[in-house]
Each structure stands twice: as C-alpha cells, then as structure tokens.
Amino acid sequence: ATSRKTRGGITSVVKAHEKGEQWNNYHCKWIETHIDKNGKYKLWYFIKGFVQFLWVLPSYDLVHIHTSEPPSALRKCLFVSFAKICRKKVIVHFHAFSPDTTVNSKYRWIYHYLFNRADRVIVLSEMWKEYVNNALQLNDKLQVIYNPCTTEILKEKHEKKNIILYAGTLNIRKGYADMIKAFALVAKTYPDWLIVFAGNGEIEQGRKLSEKLGINKQTEFLGWVNGYEKDKVFKEATIFCLPSYAEGFPMAVLDAWAYGLPVITTPVGGIPDIAKDGKNLLLFKPGDIKSLADQL
C-alpha cells in the first residue's frame, strides 16, 4: 500500500485496520510502495518496497494489495505476479473513484490482468461491484467491504464553533468551488459562520474565488492537516460538507460521523449504500449549487 505519510483514503483505511483486532490476532506487515515525492524518489521508494516484499514473502500466507488508479494498478501487477509464483493467496482491494479512468478506460487491460490473478477482489460499494463486474465479469470473486472508522471519538464531548468543514484535496472532482459558491448565497444571513477547507490542492484558486464572491473573511484554507490539527478542526466544526462529483467510499464522511458531525454530501460512489437522506445525512445532486445552499 502507500506510505504512512501519503495523504489520502488508502492510507487512512490501512491505518484504521492497524488499530483493529485482526492486526493483533494475525502476523500482519504493512509494506510501503508509494510516497508523495518527486519521480526519482518515488522510483527508489517503489524498488525498496518491492525488495522488502520479496524478502518477507516466504513468511506470509496472504498478500493484501491496495490499489486505485492505473499507475498504482500497474505497479501492483508485479507484486501479484510474484505472489502467485510463490503460490500465495492474494486479495486486491480496489479504491478508485471513477470507472471512466479505470475499468472502463483504455487501461482496462491492467485491471483485467490484476483482478484475474487475485483470489478475491474487494470493492468499496455495491455500485463499484456492478461497475467492475460489468467490465470484467469477475462474478463471485468480487466482494463489497466498506471502509472502517473508529468509534472511540463519539464518546467524547467537544466545544463547537460556527464552522462548516470541508476535508480533502481541493480539486474539481471534490467540488470545493461549489461549496464556496453555495456558501456565498447564504453568507450574509449567517455572518458569524465560516467555511474551513482542510486539504491541499487548488488553495490559491479557492482564495481568489472566495474574494471574488465577497466571502474571503468567512473562508479559511488550512492546507493539509493530520494528527492534532485534524483532530482539532473536526472537534471544532459543527457541519461537514463534501460536494464531490465522484468517490470510492469517502473516509472523510466516516471521519465526520465519528466526530458526531452532521454531513451534507452527494449520492456518489459508496455513499448511496449507507445514505438515508434526512436521517444520517443530507444529499444534493453534484453541481447543484442552489440545492447545496439550501442544505447548508
């Protein structure tokens, strides 16, 4: 899987598994094969991880591989091939956010090779099970397992502020700009409220948009947060919003629920599997800024 220092959902998922009973009950090892650095460092990191994998492979019965977009899947083909040569059982855990860039793209052959050599392929939702099966006809090999999250945080009480929180990379797919535009429609009605963005990406574009819409004083961009800073901002927030256009199964929504936050999001990826609109979250169509403003 990715490095512990890598930002994103896969790292969050594996860290959550590290805290689970299975990590203590079985002999588990996390081999890091990817990191958010420049090209040469990424290559060195991959080679180091692969050598480590080959070294420990004889001592293990099962190889659990996490993958997503085509570059990740292509790298993991090497691991699967050697695992099967050594007659190991293989699980491939698929975390992608769009079938159009993966199983329904020109890179479909990569996933065909990877998934057909696995003993089991895990996807994050019923929707993704349908996508993958329609593309590759894996049938009984496919299994849905939802992402895990901790429930310990729910036992704590937090002092709240008037904050609407967004956590994730700031890019078009995540819909951060829609959140700025929607909040601009209601900001004057709620002058003591802030929208706070916790994530890297298009921060400067976000600042310019909020200034253009006249809400720059009610908008904060924290950059990427983790550890204490992440804990602090989730505890202080009153509402969580993720206006995504495409997702696998967003860990950020699970994190928000773990902190007891009401969630506003879109019915994409694995969200429809767990969504009960008006009960455990509020939904709106991706890109519907007026509807998002109404939900806020």
Where do the model's predicted regions map?
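Glycosyltransferase donor-sugar binding loop
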Residues: 32-35, 167, 194-207, 223
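Donor nucleotide-sugar binding/catalytic pocket of nucleotide-sugar-dependent glycosyltransferases
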Residues: 116-154
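Conserved donor-binding/catalytic core segment of Leloir-type glycosyltransferases
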Residues: 149, 157-187, 195-198
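Nucleotide-activated donor-binding/catalytic signature segment of Leloir-type glycosyltransferases, i.e.
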Residues: 207-225
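Short alpha-helical donor nucleotide-sugar binding micro-motif in glycosyltransferases
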Residues: 224-225, 232-237
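Aromatic "clamp/platform" in nucleotide-sugar-dependent glycosyltransferases that forms part
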Residues: 245
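Short hydrophobic beta-strand element within catalytic cores of glycosyltransferases
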Residues: 262-265
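Conserved acidic donor-binding segment of nucleotide-sugar-dependent glycosyltransferases
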Residues: 277-278, 282-289
